[in-house]
């Protein structure tokens, strides 16, 4: 899990994405993010930098910091001409509207929220 509270993290991610996007010239870029829920507790309880960022942003939960992180990465990807996709686990109320949610749980709470105003794709288990 990267430290979502440090600006250097976003500098690193941008350099990494520039290289990766040169290798894969596709329109869409899947950010993943479903395993990031394991880092929420670290951000909330163990990382003073993330705790300070959460306080600065007025957020209380690691999930909200993940949404902030994903939105920041989305801005980088947009500059590179990509459309971001992420697993539904990382979708929240403040997720940028142009991020495509990739849903694999039928009618999960995040799916229902997304139906209101977010782009989405669905993975059929069959």
Question: Could you tell me what each predicted segment is?
Answer:
Residues 1-98, 105-107, 111-112:
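Active-site neighborhood of glycoside hydrolase catalytic domains
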Residues 109-126:
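Aromatic-lined glycan-binding groove of carbohydrate-active enzymes
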């Amino acid at each position: 899990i990267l430290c979502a509270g440090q600006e250097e993290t976003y500098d690193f991610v941008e350099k990494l994405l520039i290289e990766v996007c040169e290798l894969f010239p596709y329109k869409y870029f899947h950010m993943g993010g479903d395993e990031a829920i394991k880092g929420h507790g670290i951000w909330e309880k163990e990382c003073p930098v993330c705790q300070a960022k959460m306080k600065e942003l007025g957020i209380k939960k690691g999930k909200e910091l993940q949404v902030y992180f994903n939105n920041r990465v989305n801005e980088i990807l947009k500059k590179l001409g990509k459309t971001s996709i992420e697993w539904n686990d990382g979708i929240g109320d403040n997720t940028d509207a142009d991020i495509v949610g990739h849903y694999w749980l039928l009618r999960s709470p995040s799916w229902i929220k997304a139906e209101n105003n977010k782009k989405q794709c669905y993975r059929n288990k069959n």
